[in-house]
Swiss-Prot record:
It holds the Pfam family Ig_3. It is found in: Cell membrane; Cell junction; Cell junction, Tight junction. It is a single-pass type I membrane protein. InterPro entries: Ig-like_dom, Ig-like_dom_sf, Ig-like_fold, Ig_sub, Ig_sub2, Ig_V-set, JAM2. The chain crosses the membrane at residues 239-259. Residues 29-238 are extracellular. GO terms for biological process: cell-cell adhesion; cellular extravasation; hematopoietic stem cell migration to bone marrow; leukocyte cell-cell adhesion; leukocyte tethering or rolling; lymphocyte aggregation; maintenance of blood-brain barrier; negative regulation of myelination. SMART domains: IG, IGc2. This is Junctional adhesion molecule B. PROSITE patterns: IG_LIKE. The keyword Cell membrane applies. It is linked to Basal ganglia calcification, idiopathic, 8, autosomal recessive: A form of basal ganglia calcification, a genetically heterogeneous condition characterized by symmetric calcification in the basal ganglia and other brain regions. Affected individuals can either be asymptomatic or show a wide spectrum of neuropsychiatric symptoms, including parkinsonism, dystonia, tremor, ataxia, dementia, psychosis, seizures, and chronic headache. Serum levels of calcium, phosphate, alkaline phosphatase and parathyroid hormone are normal.
């Protein structure tokens, strides 16, 4: 009896497992572990492949672009949005004829098909990376500088993907990243950062006078900004000394003039003249006041 009860219990457990597995297959979903990464150059084509079982007549396919908000790319057997004019369906796959940088992101295809146990859903995820060539970089080059000072030139591009590297040119000749390897006719005190695009002269000299341009380059392409001239002049020490001497002479002449006027009594005469005018005005006022008082009494 004990053996029979054990056999019955095992049979019940096996039946339960079969039902559970069938339920999972019917109503669950499966996705490939390895996610695809598709790389495409901007304005060229890309194919987003959906790695699922073969398509059947009753299969239903949907493509979605994932992000902050999920948007349909292919829904109810029709491409959505601007994909209508620049994409086509090849079986379960999407062929984008003209990729733009805004297409970059994650996409998911969902395939549902009826089975004996119910509706079966499978999905696959594809990441699209769009490579973009640099635009014309913005270059900041000072028009003038004094020798011996620190001068920094800047170059930047905000569109390239992957991020570009930068190279500086002087009078059309490429500047080496290590200035010590260059000729003796160039200033070896500069520092070039190919990642950030800065060119810094620790002590700029007259040898650095010239036309500077910058090139941004990545695996897709390169662009260069128009050249800008930088003029480096020596500090005019003799001119500064001459200006200081002239100012000192002017101040000295003005001081001597004031002393001479005081000795000649120009300032004292002016004071006595002001005193006489004030006394005469006071006398006139007192007489008028007296006459007015007398007439009032009468």
């Amino acid at each position: 009896m004990a053996r029979r009860s054990r056999h019955r219990l095992l049979l019940l457990l096996l039946r339960y497992l079969v039902v559970a597995l069938g339920y999972h297959k019917a109503y669950g979903f499966s996705a490939p572990k390895d996610q695809q990464v598709v790389t495409a150059v901007e304005y060229q084509e890309a194919i987003l492949a959906c790695k699922t079982p073969k398509k059947t007549v009753s299969s239903r396919l949907e493509w979605k672009k994932l992000g902050r908000s999920v948007s349909f790319v292919y829904y109810q057997q029709t491409l959505q949005g601007d994909f209508k004019n620049r994409a086509e369906m090849i079986d379960f796959n999407i062929r984008i004829k003209n990729v733009t940088r805004s297409d970059a992101g994650k996409y998911r295809c969902e395939v549902s098909a009826p089975s004996e146990q119910g509706q079966n859903l499978e999905e696959d995820t594809v990441t699209l990376e769009v490579l973009v060539a640099p635009a014309v970089p913005s270059c900041e080059v000072p028009s003038s500088a004094l020798s011996g000072t620190v001068v920094e030139l800047r170059c930047q591009d905000k569109e390239g993907n992957p991020a570009p590297e930068y190279t500086w040119f002087k009078d059309g000749i490429r500047l080496l990243e290590n200035p010590r390897l260059g000729s003796q006719s160039t200033n070896s005190s500069y520092t070039m950062n190919t990642k950030t695009g800065t060119l810094q002269f620790n002590t700029v000299s007259k040898l650095d006078t010239g036309e500077y341009s910058c090139e941004a380059r990545n695996s897709v392409g390169y662009r260069r900004c128009p050249g800008k001239r930088m003029q480096v002049d020596d500090l005019n020490i003799s001119g500064i000394i001459a200006a200081v001497v002239v100012v000192a002479l002017v101040i000295s002449v003005c001081g001597l003039g004031v002393c001479y006027a005081q000795r000649k009594g120009y300032f004292s005469k002016e004071t006595s003249f002001q005193k006489s005018n004030s006394s005469s005005k006071a006398t006139t006022m007192s007489e008028n006041d007296f006459k007015h008082t007398k007439s009032f009494i009468i």
